[in-house]
Amino acid sequence: DGHFDYVQEHLRILSAFYGVLKPMDGITPYRLEMQAKAAIGDSTNLYDFWGDNLYWEVIDDSWIIINLASKEYSKCIEKYLTPDDRYITISFCEQSGGRLITKGTYAKMARGEMVRYMAENHIENPDDIKEFDHLGYVFRDDISSDREYIFERKTVK
């Protein structure tokens, strides 16, 4: 219970068209990527257009941001981080050819599962995220840092 309230309070979705959305916000379907060229006023692209507005919409009194966004969207926030912010990127990887790689489809599914996990467990402390073990992913403490939590998907051979 309270899962919808949790995501409505804690989850923010970055949109190239709308800016920052809450899960229950109504929108009209559109197709616009953040990296699209767009001449709007004095801006030549959407990163310039949005400026630091997206950052100020997602930061709150905790000064903690758990980043599940793609690189395309997380750039909108990272540029404006301050030393007081605790910004943690969650990465979902798997072994391939002796190195860790991110497979887009699996990473997208894992990001959704992470949101579900956080809502179901009402996560307030970022360290509690490390217990996530859905879709075969496990936290890798040995290669993670305070700024990046790396989860590796264990594949069946």
Regions found by a protein language model. Give the residues of each.
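Internal, well-folded beta-alpha domain core
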Residues: 1-146, 150, 154-157
